[in-house]
From Swiss-Prot:
Any one of the GO CC terms: membrane
Residue ranges constituting the COR domain according to the UniProt record: 757-931
Native source species: Arabidopsis thaliana
Tissue: Expressed in seedlings, roots, leaves, stems and flowers. Present in ovules, prominently in nucellus and integuments.
Protein name: Protein TORNADO 1
Keyword set, alphabetical order: Auxin signaling pathway, Developmental protein, GTP-binding, Hydrolase, Leucine-rich repeat, Membrane, Nucleotide-binding, Repeat, Transmembrane, Transmembrane helix
Phenotypic effect of disruption: Severe dwarfism combined with twisted and malformed organs, and sterility. Loss of initial meristematic divisions in the epidermal/lateral root cap. Defection in basipetal transport of auxin (IAA) leading to several development aberrations.
Protein's gene: TRN1
Gene3D superfamilies: P-loop containing nucleotide triphosphate hydrolases (3.40.50.300), Ribonuclease Inhibitor (3.80.10.10)
Length: 1380
């Protein structure tokens, strides 16, 4: 136990003597504070490292003597680091003596002035001191009224000083002039790392943050405004260089324009958040330039900023040229359909051949009650959803202008989208009705790529129908962070929450409890309004004997904000509890001890610290992934304890710092780190004072960013506290008591008459209780009938004991992990009894044992063997044992069994994992889902610690947890049914249950080698024996249609100590994929070909007979033979074989239909080519070839030119051999140089280039031979066949209108008749004739030399063509040479 610090008062002479005496070894001062108050002069040792010296107002000269003595005795005071001054009225002589002290020491790093007063002469002297000092790192002024003049002098000093790293000016008024002076300092000073200011004027923020951004300073900035005396404060600006995040909470229009101008060439900001700031088109015009010039911005949030149509037009124009922005949030604004159209234009394509203008934006959110999307806006949304290839997250929030039919159209369009993963429709009033539900369900069946649909606060969710959608997506039904809303809740006002949680994460012996106590003590000593005592339900005797290990919660208040410190237990057996404790709003303190145990002096190695920190970061990310998608990244601060025992300059500590920095870089995209790593002595309140200040500021910032709550919740929190005080601190509140409290104390939740709709009031009460649950004030579930008011009691005593239950020691009737309800209740009573003889149990005093069982079932800690029986046995996963040593085999294993497996792996296992609580929860959750099935009779379900074994409908399934820290799940199946039926069961039952239990961690699906499944190969040997499902489908999409059914995937061999465990082999794709997967691949190929056919205007209805092969039929789904119960004999088996054979024939028929469709399109292609070659035989008697193209030399190769731009130089023109049905690129063709392309050339050639590139694209897609020489000249075909016939380019217009121009031009092309097309072809031909004449290449001989082509006439029809020498020889009997 640490001894109490000496609190006795000493006189000043004692202190002067002590600093002169080198024998005073106990005197190890780090912080020395000076104050001027009272009538006595004295000194007081606060802790072993901090002291306060108080002098009376008329005895300030004694401070000069102290400064001089300190200056001359520095060799004995090497530990002094900080000087603090409170209430000092400075005179010039006193300040000069302080300057003497600072000039004679390099040890003092911090100066703090609180409520000091300086004359102008003193400010000048202080400025001179700072100019010549090279050792100070931090200077802080608090309520010291330095004003404009002081800011000017500080700025001039810091223009010279290059060592100061932190400057803080709190609760002062430097004014805009002072801010301008400090901004000039920022332009000159590159060493300042932290700048904080709290000023009465909000206009001080603009010049300061503009200077930081304009000069690309890596400086952390915090700016506040308000009047602290009236408790009014507002954060204006925050810049965190560590996360490269700039947040602007409030700013005037001129200031916002100035900041935008500074952002243009900035390289330090990656995320810009201006949510709630008022902006207009003047700002947007400046911001357009930012989007066009800035290369580092990745995220922009402009929610609720009042933007109108004109402003959004500027932003959209910037998106056309932007190549870096990934996320844009413009919800809650006031623009209409015009704004929506412009906003989505750069993200849309108006032809399959047009290049999407912006391909970097991945997430876009718009909408709001004042955003009127309208008909035109809906059209733009449909076009974007249908054609966009890059957006992953689309959000339309709080919309009231679209109806159910509109959303049905949107979901229908989503069926064709291959990029969108998350679609958010929060608060949209038109998302209602069964037809919308059917549209969503149909879309999810057709498009399997959609991972999340957010229907929070929509009528569809309010009616309870959204649960079906969430289950299909693999989510946990209704979102946890959204309160239920309906018509009865509309008039309930919302407000910011007033409570926040700080989770202290760390292993045992990290010092979390000691640190928590010091934070509370520091907060109390800092003059905060008041501090709540720790919630305490036990008498002092019980506190002494209480076992360590539960969760501790301590609370204090900062103004109106309640901050709860949640001390998570460090022991491994409690990790499963942590999954239940992550609501919003919250942030995390990861506490790491630099020593293995506090009782010894053995420090941890950097690798040990790194391993521990990485675990907790992965743990936080794994549990916060869903929160990332909905709100914000988890906020994490790193704290190193026991730092007083080590040398912070040692190589070992610096190596530890390097390890921490590597992890921060690794997790930067998923976690919002506070840039400072705190090193503290957890026992010392002064040592944690900065950490305490950080906790206060972080809490306020987080509460401004999280979703709002019902205003009534903040009022009811106090009523619940009063109720507990009046009821002997009961931790449990029955629902009847809560209803009575609402009836008597809350008028808006009161039933006023018998004629009133009681159900509406009850709905409101339940909504308030649910909101309190989400805020972390209570624990409440609808069907349990009570509220838990004390988190610490429930988590620290009740759940902790439940997790640690060992029923095996007390149960005599255990059967396969099951225990009877009576035995479990008996065990609960004995485990929860008080350890003090004669004292009643504090748990069972408020909780009945049956309530505990209900709670365990609710949080999926156990399940009932027979839910229909009130005395059913229960299974508690904590009593399960591992199955090591047991023989692993399938229950059925015949020669006709089908073996299949799926490997579900974390998509980012380096940043997240399946937490320890996942698999026990999955064991219960999957059992409950199976029991809910209507046709589950006869199913068996057995468990081991890391295994779930299921038999249902004749299919045996094993679900295995694998990998270090649970990186993957293997689902293995042995079935007497077909592969398709087996995989349908896995995808409809097993995988959704797994996804809904893993807290939003994304799992990627792979196919396990069937031989590994059949032999139950140990997991360590099958790590290389799986292939990505997506990759296999892509491979099938790339092979010719006739080879799809026989496509093979090869497997590598597996060796163990030189011994072959698995031989190399292969499996046919049809034995790895279900018929559903095959049909999906076929549908996508049909879809791609259909789109290309439409672009070529190829008719698809000329051959009605072919249509019989094209559609994918669903006749097989009507075959549903029953395999339950006893087999019905040989006839049933033969019938089943016939069905399987029919499935194979149908699948082969569909593949044959695909190939036939490709053949039809190839014939149409030849017709199109022949038209282009011979569009007018009489035109100058074909004096020059028709089919020409341009290339450019690039990296020792050739690149096909797909678009013409005025001013292009160094091109080369080539021509194709035009022999019918065998057109090709001529090898070794010299070609002819084109020095420059002018505007006239572009106008003539653009329509020709459009038609030519369409044919090239289509030919390459269906494998036409004539395009074989083109493919290698088009590195990325899908993105380069664009800019065709771009009118904006031809007329020199701005690129911002390019996308609209292309859409209009290509739309006109489809409507032109043959005469117009001939005019376009004639213009291109005439340009070629004129050009060749200029190059003196107009004769047949010249063309043969340059292009290797000869003019011939076909013998059969007399048409003219230009063909190569090879065709001249091999097809001489078909042509006659016709020289010019």
């Amino acid at each position: 136990m640490e001894s109490e610090p000496d609190q006795s008062f000493k006189d000043l002479s004692w202190f002067l003597q002590a600093i002169k005496d080198p024998q005073q070894t106990f005197f190890n001062l780090q912080t020395l504070s000076f104050s001027s108050s009272g009538n006595t002069t004295h000194c007081q040792l606060i802790t072993e490292s901090s002291m306060n010296i108080n002098v009376t107002r008329d005895n300030l000269t004694s401070l000069s003597q102290i400064f001089i003595e300190l200056a001359t005795s520095l060799e004995t005071q090497t530990s002094l680091r900080n000087l603090e001054f409170e209430g000092i009225f400075w005179e010039i002589e006193l300040l000069q003596s302080l300057g003497l002290l600072l000039d004679n020491t390099s040890k003092i790093k911090q100066l703090a002035f609180r409520k000091n007063r300086f004359s102008e002469q003193c400010l000048n002297e202080l400025s001179e001191i700072l100019k010549r000092n090279r050792f100070l790192k931090e200077v802080m002024f608090l309520e010291s009224s330095i004003g404009y003049r002081g800011a000017t002098l500080l700025g001039s000093a810091l223009q010279v000083n290059d060592s100061l790293e932190e400057l803080q000016i709190w609760e002062d008024s430097i004014g805009s002039k002072g801010a301008e002076e400090l901004s000039r300092m920022i332009e000159m000073n590159s060493s300042l790392k932290l700048f904080s200011i709290f000023d009465s004027s909000p206009f001080t923020a603009t010049p300061l943050i503009s200077a930081v951004l304009g000069m690309n300073r890596e400086m952390e900035v915090h700016m506040w405004s308000g009047d602290h005396k009236r408790d009014r404060s507002l954060k204006l600006v925050e810049f965190l260089p560590e996360s490269k995040t700039l947040r602007i909470y409030q700013i005037d229009i001129s200031g916002s324009c100035r900041v935008a101008a500074a952002l243009g060439m900035n390289t330090t900001v990656r995320s810009l958040d201006m949510t709630g700031a008022k902006l207009n088109s003047r700002w947007a015009k400046e911001f357009r330039w930012v989007l066009e010039q800035n290369k580092t911005l990745r995220e922009v949030k402009l929610s609720k900023t009042g933007l109108k149509d004109k402003a959004v037009v500027y932003i959209a124009a910037g998106l056309f040229k932007n190549k870096s922005l990934q996320s844009l949030y413009v919800d809650g604004n006031r623009f209409g359909s015009v704004g929506v159209e412009d906003l989505l234009c750069p993200l849309s394509r108006f032809s399959a051949l047009q290049l999407q203008a912006n391909i970097t934006l991945r997430s876009i959110v718009f909408g709001g009650s004042n955003t009127k999307i309208g008909r035109d806006g809906l059209t733009a949304v449909l076009k974007m959803v249908t054609t966009n290839e890059t957006v992953v997250h689309l959000g339309i929030h709080d919309d009231a202008s679209l109806g159910p039919d509109d959303f049905i159209h949107i979901f229908k369009s989503l069926q064709k989208n291959a990029s969108l993963r998350r679609f958010s429709l929060q608060g949209c009033k038109g998302v209602r009705g069964d037809r919308v539900l059917e549209a969503i369900t149909e879309t999810l069946q057709i498009n399997p790529l959609i991972e999340e649909i957010d229907l929070a606060r929509t009528p569809l969710q309010d009616s309870g129908k959204a649960d079906e959608i969430y289950q299909k997506l693999g989510h946990n039904g209704r979102k946890i962070d959204e309160a239920e809303t309906d018509d009865s809740l509309k008039d309930m006002p919302l407000t910011e929450p007033k409570s926040v949680r700080a989770f202290l994460c760390g292993q045992n012996y990290a010092g979390k409890t000691t640190l928590c106590n010091s934070i509370l003590q520091s907060s109390s000593a800092s003059g905060f309004p008041y501090v709540e005592n720790v919630r305490n339900l036990m008498n002092p005797v019980e506190q002494v004997v209480k076992t360590v290990g539960g969760m501790k919660i301590k609370t204090f208040k900062d103004e109106e904000t309640k901050i709860s410190m949640w001390n998570l237990a460090g022991q491994h057996e409690f990790f499963a509890l942590h999954d239940l404790m992550f609501p919003s709003p919250c942030f995390f303190l990861i506490v790491l001890s630099l020593f293995r145990k506090p009782s010894n002096k053995e420090p941890k190695t950097p690798a040990e610290v790194e391993e521990e920190l990485e675990y907790w970061l992965r743990f936080i990310v794994s549990n916060s992934r869903k929160a990332i998608q909905q709100c914000m990244k988890p906020n994490v601060t790193i704290v190193l304890t026991h730092s007083e025992k080590i040398n912070l300059q040692s190589e070992s500590f610096q190596a530890t710092v390097g390890c921490i920095q590597r992890l921060r870089d690794k997790f930067q995209a998923l976690v919002e780190f506070y840039p400072t790593v705190f090193t503290v002595d957890a026992r010392s309140s002064p040592s944690v004072s900065k950490l305490t200040h950080h906790i206060r500021m972080t809490s306020k910032a987080i509460l401004q960013r999280v979703p709002r709550v019902y205003q009534l919740c903040n009022d009811i929190v106090q009523l619940l506290s009063d109720w507990r005080s009046e009821n002997s601190n009961k931790p449990i509140m029955r629902w009847k008591a809560f209803a009575d409290l609402c009836q008597f104390k809350v008028p808006s939740l009161r039933i006023k008459s018998r004629n009133e709709n009681i159900q509406i009031v009850e709905t409101r009460r339940h909504a308030i209780a649910t909101c309190l649950h989400q805020m972390g004030e209570v624990i409440y579930f609808d069907d349990l009938g009570f509220l838990i008011l004390d988190y610490e009691w429930f988590c620290g005593e009740v759940l902790t004991q439940l997790i640690k239950l060992d029923v095996r020691k007390q149960s005599t009737g255990e059967r396969n992990g099951f225990v009877s309800r009576k035995e479990l209740e008996k065990t609960l009573r004995s485990s929860l009894q008080s350890p003090i003889p004669g004292m009643t149990s504090k748990v069972l005093e408020h909780f009945d044992a049956c309530d505990l069982v209900k709670m365990m079932k609710k949080v999926e800690l156990c399940y009932e063997q027979d839910p229909s029986s009130p005395d059913s046995s229960l299974l508690v996963p904590s009593i399960l044992e591992e199955g090591r040593g047991k023989t692993q085999k399938w229950q059925i294993n015949t020669h006709d069994c089908v073996y299949s497996g799926r490997h579900l792996q974390c998509d980012d296992s380096s940043h997240m994992f399946l937490t320890a609580g996942f698999f026990p929860r999955l064991q219960v959750h999957l059992h409950n889902r199976i029991m809910e099935l209507k046709n589950q009779h006869g199913a068996t379900y057995s468990l081991e610690k890391y295994l779930i074994a299921i038999t249902i409908h004749g299919i045996n399934i094993r679900v295995e947890l694998g990998g270090q820290l649970g990186n993957y799940i293997d689902v293995l199946a042995c079935s007497s049914k077909s592969l398709t039926e087996t995989l349908r069961l896995i995808h409809q039952l097993i995988i959704p249950a797994i996804q809904s239990s893993c807290r939003g961690v994304i799992l990627l699906e792979h196919i396990i080698r069937p031989q590994c499944v059949q032999d139950l190969t140990p997991p360590r040997f099958r790590q290389s024996q799986f292939v990505s499902l997506h990759r296999l489908k892509e491979a099938l999409s790339s092979v010719p249609a006739e080879t799809m059914y026989d496509y093979q995937h090869t497997w590598d061999s597996v060796l163990d100590s030189g011994k072959t465990v698995l031989r190399a082999g292969f499996d046919l794709a049809r034995n790895l994929l279900s018929d559903d997967d095959f049909r999906e691949v076929l549908q996508r190929r049909y879809h791609d070909l259909h789109n290309l056919a439409q672009e070529l205007q190829v008719p698809t209805d000329e051959n009605p007979e072919a249509d019989n092969h094209v559609p994918v039929t669903n006749e097989l789904e009507k075959v549903d033979p029953s395999f339950g119960g006893i087999a019905k004999g040989v006839e049933a088996v033969l019938q089943r074989l016939k069905i399987i054979e029919q499935e194979i024939r149908d699948l082969k028929q569909e593949i044959q239909g695909l190939r036939y469709y490709e053949h039809r399109l190839l014939i149409q292609l030849h017709h199109k080519v022949n038209y282009l070659v011979n569009y007018n035989v009489q035109m100058d008697e074909r004096k020059v070839p028709n089919m020409f193209y341009f290339i450019r030399a690039e990296n020792y190769g050739r690149r096909l030119i797909t678009s013409m731009v005025p001013g292009m130089v160094a091109l080369r023109i080539h021509m194709l051999c035009e022999f019918r049905r065998e057109m090709h690129v001529v090898e070794d063709q010299l070609g002819c140089d084109v020095m420059q392309i002018d505007n006239q050339a572009v106008k003539c050639l653009a329509p020709y280039m459009t038609n030519f590139m369409k044919l090239v694209t289509f030919a390459l897609r269906i494998g036409a031979n004539w395009a074989a020489g083109m493919g290698h000249m088009i590195p990325d075909l899908s993105h380069t066949i664009a800019h065709l016939a771009n009118p904006a380019v031809m007329t020199g217009a701005a690129g911002a209108a390019g996308a609209i121009g292309v859409a209009a031009a290509l739309g006109r092309n489809r409507g032109r008749d043959r005469d117009i097309q001939e005019q376009e072809q004639r213009a291109a031909q005439q340009w070629l004739i004129d050009y060749l004449r200029e190059q003196t290449c107009s004769t047949g001989r010249d063309i043969a030399e340059k292009f290797g082509l000869w003019r011939v006439r076909y013998r059969d029809d007399g048409s003219i063509a230009w063909i190569c020498k090879r065709h001249m020889i091999t097809r001489a009997h078909e042509v006659i040479q016709v020289p010019l």
